[in-house]
Amino acid sequence: MNCLPDELLVQILSFLPTKEATSTSLLSKRWRTLFTLSPNLDFDNSLLLQSKKRKWNMRNIQKSFVGFVDSTLALQGGKGIKSFSLKFKETLGDVNGEVDVNRWICNALEHGVSELHLRIDYTKRCHLPSEIFTSTKLVKLSLVTQSCFPVVPNCISLPSLKVLFLDSIWFEVPQFLIFLTACPALEDLTIYQKPHSVGMPYHISSKTIKRLSVTYTCGYFVDYGLKLFNTPSVVDLYYSDYVRHKYPHMNLDSLPKATLDIHFLDDNAANVTELLSGIRNVKTLHLTSSTVKVILLCCKGEIPMFENLINLKFSGKTRQWKFLLPLLLEICPNLTTLVLSGLDQNWFVGFRTPPNNQVKMLSIMQYQGSERELKLISYFVLKMECLQVVKVYVSSPMNDLKKMQLTEDLLKLPKASPKLNIQVLVPSDTYLPALKVLFLDSVWFDFHQFANVFFPACPALEDFAIHIKSFRRKARSENELEHISHFSLKMEFLEVLKVYVALTMDDTKKVELTKELLKLPISSSKLIIQVM
């Protein structure tokens, strides 16, 4: 690591909690002030409380933490702060907790912080500093607490805020509406309310929000709270709640994607018809297994037509799925892609498939190879005449012999069309299309899976650094060369591979290692391997 330039070392330190980054100042004279150059600060007193609570009393632990944060912020001088993260748990008898936290927050804001993440657990009702709501630099804001009540000032203005995450934050009704109005650039809003929370914002109104996630985990007073979704620009909606008597009015003009996770309560008056009507223009819809049950039991009116729905992800873990799926196929005349999961949970007894369905691609998730699953797939490939592709994702773990047998069973199924293509696939939920820089420090993983699954899922990856403790040992592991060869073979666009050997390795071993590395098979003749 000493061979790396200061700029890269500072970037690496920025990924660490500030406590760990500060400890590197003991390594050498060069490292003494490197941590102060990091634009990211991450403080967490819960780790300190857990590690020292048997040796020190709580008051001394908290005093030590306060002194550490104050001294670290003082070292910033006039340098800017990009990200400030604070996890703070107030201890009994701490009378200055709120004062200390508010001082640190204001200090970060004065240094032009653009990302502010607060997770605060007070023992009493407290308020956040009003300066949070008048920052012109904030781009991301996360507020997580159980007892903070924001006081929104009249001069509220957050012109740069794009991402807002609220967990158990309680606003007065008009205050939250004023809050959103003061965020003209807001694109991503997440609201999470726990059972102990007092309530939710009544109205969510914004013309700029593109991604909206609302989760309400309290089954009591379910009709208290949300009254309006006035978010016409939303392209991705996640809504998790208990079934209600009356749902908020939804202004979602052209919703491309939505996920519904509605949970059942033993309430005969509950009704989800209004909710379904509010998202009837959606193009891609995911219904969880609990939502499937709720729709069947709590839809008092006629289910609206989903004229624009093209992609449907449907969970069949409840017995009632076979009654709802045919109905959905009828009310979704333009549905072309159907994804089903949990089909091994219930016996297949057959159901009616609408003759006019237009489903062209069917995906079966978590396939176990059971008799009931095979019968269901057989029914689909016979009755769905428009089917072109059936993708069956086998459940993991599963040995190669069983996968081969499942594949043979599926390919033998009679089909409505000879052109139908059945594919048996191993699932991968990993996809990071925008990832450019990746640094791993002592992370243990399956190298074969990492090379075959992870790297193909990162098409934009440009800078990859890996630090594995075994590489630093004097006695080299037998598997190291095998691991490195995976990188040199699987990363086709790799241009430079630098191997930093242990400082204790003598010159003879370095020469031997260099020869072995240069013999490794590579995916490109342009790849340069350097031993540092």
From Swiss-Prot:
Keywords: Leucine-rich repeat, Repeat
Gene Ontology BP term (one): protein polyubiquitination
Gene Ontology molecular-function annotations: ubiquitin protein ligase activity
LRR repeats: 113-135, 279-305, 398-420
InterPro entries assigned to the protein according to its UniProt record, in alphabetical order: F-box-like_dom_sf, F-box_AtFBL13-like, F-box_dom, FBD, FBL60-like, LRR_FXL15/At3g58940/PEG3-like, LRR_PRU1-like
One of the Pfam families matching this protein, by short name: F-box
Keyword rRNA-binding: no
The F-box domain, residue ranges: 1-46
Keyword hit for NAD: no
Protein name, UniProt field: Putative F-box/LRR-repeat protein At3g42770
Native source species: Arabidopsis thaliana (Mouse-ear cress)
